[in-house]
Amino acid sequence: MPRYFEGKLDAKGQKIGIVVSRFNSFITERLLEGAVDALVRHGADEQEIHIARVPGAFEIPLAAKKMAASGAYDAIIALGAVIRGSTPHFDYVSSEVTKGVAAVSLESGVPISFGVLTTDSIEQAVERAGTKAGNKGFEAAVTVIETVNLLRSIN
C-alpha cells in the first residue's frame, strides 16, 4: 500500500517570516492582514510572526534570502503587488520576483509561499486583496502552513 504525505493546517509552533512590499501599499497591507489572520486562525503565535517591509516587489527575493539564511524561520511568505502599466517594467519586475523567490526557496530548502499579485489592473489587485477573489495573502499563509507540515512529515 502506498504511503501518503500531507500537511496539516496547524501553525502551532511555526515561526513565519513575511516579506511585504510597501509599493502599492493600499493592496499589500490588505494582503498582509489576510496572511497574519490566516496564521493566527490556524494556531500561530503572533510573537512568532516576523514582518520585513521592503520598498518594492523587486527587493522581496533578497530579503527572503536573508530570512531563509538566518535559519530562524520555518517558512516565509512573500507579499507584493505588481500592476501592469504602459511600459514593459511590469514584465521585468514580475518575472524576476517570481524567479528570485523560487530560487531562494529551492536553494535554501525553506518553503516560501508566493503571494505577490501580478495583475493587469488596480481593480484586479483589489479583487485579490480581500474582495471578490478572496485574499491571496490569506491563501499564501494557508499554503505555507500546510507545506511546512508536509515537509516535516516527509522527514
Swiss-Prot record:
Kindly give the InterPro entries that the UniProt entry links to this protein.
LS, LS/RS, LS/RS_sf
- What does UniProt give as GO cellular component? cytosol; riboflavin synthase complex
Q: Which biological process terms from the Gene Ontology are attached to this UniProt entry?
A: riboflavin biosynthetic process
Q: Which domain of life is it from?
A: Bacteria
Uppermost EC category:
transferase
Where does the record place the catalytic residues? 89
- For binding 5-amino-6-(D-ribitylamino)uracil, which residues are annotated in this chain's numbering? 23, 57-59, 81-83, 114
Q: Which residues bind (2S)-2-hydroxy-3-oxobutyl phosphate?
A: 86-87, 128
Pathway assignment reads: Cofactor biosynthesis; riboflavin biosynthesis; riboflavin from 2-hydroxy-3-oxobutyl phosphate and 5-amino-6-(D-ribitylamino)uracil: step 1/2
An example Gene Ontology molecular-function term: 6,7-dimethyl-8-ribityllumazine synthase activity
Q: CDD domains annotated for this entry?
A: Lumazine_synthase-I
Q: Which reaction does it catalyse?
A: (2S)-2-hydroxy-3-oxobutyl phosphate + 5-amino-6-(D-ribitylamino)uracil = 6,7-dimethyl-8-(1-D-ribityl)lumazine + phosphate + 2 H2O + H(+)
Q: What is its EC number?
A: 2.5.1.78
Q: Keywords in UniProt for this one?
A: Riboflavin biosynthesis, Transferase
Please state which protein family the record places this protein in. Belongs to the DMRL synthase family.
Q: What is the recorded function of this protein according to its Swiss-Prot or TrEMBL entry?
A: Catalyzes the formation of 6,7-dimethyl-8-ribityllumazine by condensation of 5-amino-6-(D-ribitylamino)uracil with 3,4-dihydroxy-2-butanone 4-phosphate. This is the penultimate step in the biosynthesis of riboflavin.
| Protein name per its UniProtKB record | 6,7-dimethyl-8-ribityllumazine synthase
Annotated source species: Pelobacter propionicus (strain DSM 2379 / NBRC 103807 / OttBd1)
The lineage is: Bacteria, Pseudomonadati, Thermodesulfobacteriota, Desulfuromonadia, Desulfuromonadales
